[in-house]
Design a protein with these regions (language model features):
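Short, acidic/small-residue loops that bind anionic groups at enzyme active sites
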Residues: 176-201, 290-307
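C-terminal functional extensions of proteins
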Residues: 298-324
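Hydrophobic alpha-helical
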Residues: 258-288, 303-304
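N-terminal glycine-rich phosphate/adenylate-binding segment common to multiple enzyme folds
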Residues: 140-188, 192-195, 274-282
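A polyampholytic, Gly/Pro-enriched intrinsically disordered region
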Residues: 134-142, 206-217, 254-265, 315-324
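Gly/Ser/Thr-rich loops at beta-strand to alpha-helix junctions
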Residues: 88-94, 163-172, 214-219, 277-282, ...
Length: 324
């Protein structure tokens, strides 16, 4: 699963180009081309270090004592291995929490990996019925690319689109259309739920799945259709009918566990899939996977897993669900 670095005219071994970094410095561009560890596709890993830092030592009188010698550049002190930009709906409180839980539990193995979140403005976060869902889709899509462009201010190397696009779209091409605009606008590759869910289910050889979503009937119908279009059989599906993005984050784990036992355990399934980035699933997976002997693929752990594996970080992790 390790990624391959393709040495080319932008690589560390043969720097022939420069670029202007956000601090205004013109410096070498040591970008690399990567073959994704899961997708096998080639994408660019940009150089976000060679132009940094511009700094100088100043004494108590305000006099400049010396310039910091940048040399070939220095990496971000905390995200020196991989800097991930994460696009998160403004109502969401679970994405960063679950991803940081995984990173903190595996401090040594993920040292130098950082996530840097940018909110997608969703001023009309209600989606309790078909009309509200359509309005929510319009607002979300209108603000997604702007959020991605804002995320570039942190100079990320790779993006994660932390959203369940199947809430809106069952068609595979429509589902990929908005994340594709993000990649085109930023020039960065992105982990999406459609990519991560498919790769995760393939890892377990799953065909029949149980689907847990926070959606209303229209959203649940879209989600079922999406996974069927990916080639999976949805043996059982449960929507929680949450009225808004904020409501999703307040559904207690005990209730989700009840739904899993009542709706999925009696059914012959290969995996449980949890959609909705504000519907926390990591603690449930850690509690139930071994007991039920069924993998629980939650969107937030799966998105981080996909981003790490695509970028060649393949070590098994603890406290992160069976997926890792």
């Amino acid at each position: 699963l390790k990624s391959t670095i393709i040495m080319n005219e932008h690589s560390l071994d043969n720097v022939t180009k420069t670029k202007t970094y956000l601090n205004g410095v013109d410096a070498p561009d040591r970008s690399k081309s990567i073959v994704g560890g899961l997708s096998g596709t080639v994408f660019k890993l940009p150089d976000v270090n060679s132009g940094y830092p511009v700094a100088k030592l100043i004494d108590e009188s305000g006099a400049e004592v010396e310039d910091f010698q940048r040399g070939d550049g220095y990496p971000d002190t905390r995200s020196h291995r991989l800097k991930l930009g994460v696009l998160v709906p403004a109502t969401n409180c679970m994405v960063e929490s679950e991803m940081w839980d995984i990173i903190v539990r595996n401090r040594e193995l993920l040292s130098g990996v950082g996530i840097h979140a940018t909110n997608i403005l969703t001023p009309a976060p209600k989606f309790g019925n078909a009309e509200e869902l359509e309005n929510y889709k319009t607002v979300f899509n209108a603000n997604l690319v702007e959020a991605a462009e804002t995320a570039l201010l942190a100079e990320p190397q790779y993006l994660i689109v932390a959203f369940s696009m199947e809430h809106f779209y069952s068609d595979l091409d429509e589902n990929a259309s908005q994340p594709r605009l993000v990649e085109q606008s930023t020039g960065l590759s992105a982990a999406t739920w459609s990519k991560a869910a498919d790769a995760a289910l393939k890892k377990f050889g799953a065909r029949r799945i149980g689907l847990l979503c926070p959606f209303d009937p229209r959203g649940l119908e879209n989600a079922i259709g999406f996974f069927e279009n990916l080639g999976y059989e949805v043996a059982s599906a449960a929507g929680l009918g949450c009225a808004s993005g904020t409501d999703v984050g307040h559904v207690p784990d005990a209730y989700k566990e009840k739904v899993i036992h009542e709706r999925f355990v009696p059914v012959d399934i290969d995996a449980i899939v949890v959609c909705g980035t504000n519907l926390a699933s990591l603690a449930l997976a850690e509690k139930l996977e071994q007991k039920l002997d069924i993998p629980i693929i939650g969107i937030n752990p799966a998105l981080l897993w996909y981003a790490l594996r695509e970028n060649g970080i393949s070590a098994p992790l603890l406290g992160a669900s069976r997926l890792f």
